Amino acid sequence: MTAPPLPTAVRIRDVGARDGLQAESPIPVAQRIALIEAILAAGVTHIELAAFVSPKAVPSMAGAAEVIAAIGLRAGVVRTALVPNVRGAQMAIEAGLDEVTVIFSASAVYNERNVKMSIDQSLAQIEQICSLDEIPPVDAVMSCSFGSPYEGDIAPADVAALCVRLRSAGATNVTLADTTGMATPRRIGEVLELTGTDVGMHLHETRGTGLLNAFAALQAGVTRFDSSVAGLGGSPFAAGAAGNIATEEWVAVLDDLGVSTGIDIERLIEAAMLVEAFIGRRVPSRVAHAGPRSRRASS
């Protein structure tokens, strides 16, 4: 049997400066800006810069407006930030962002613990955000799309129904997130069979299946992926949750498959090692340390 052809190109949104750093001890704004510049210099054209959240709740995201102002408009680059509520969305509008991400969960218990709202309340808030004047495109990131540590499996039909409700609320795009690392290639296929492939994928390496799941989604026809430089990330509401798939590891796979990303992997590895210097510990990305398979040993 001949496998269907892979997409010729994918769009990667690097979330390292927000999702990657939010679980770390705070680093100076100047270092966050330097990291973003390094990621952009590698050719990344879609990047999550910060989150408009309370600095008391998430100290590592203090200074979001300062970070965004320092980056400014970039031709061909989509700059996004996480907004947890209407006030955060208003701040994002004032900052002139190209996109905002909102968080939502397919797990009722996780949603309650994360944003202190029911699923219906979250959908109502997302609708409010989407109806704001001058709101940029909204990407609704649905956590626990492939399972919850509280309820267990989430039925693919329920995930598909929530995608419909999110789009009805005004979301421009929907991204399916494997927040707790419960996805498998089989479950990826089962969900995509009902949601269709016009979704993004946000995958974690909690159980070491992140890249396998990304490849399964790619084979199904998905072309939008979140990943984090150096493989940082996690969730304070999911015990043991590991980082996102590392951008440089996913790019290394895609390069070998002949799938275009527009990203220079060696420059991206430089950004990953910058992260390591800033946080003061070894980052989980294996490609950041071993390099891509195309790298040759020095004589």
What are the roles of these predicted feature ranges?
Residues 1-299:
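Catalytic cores and adjacent flexible loops of soluble metabolic enzymes
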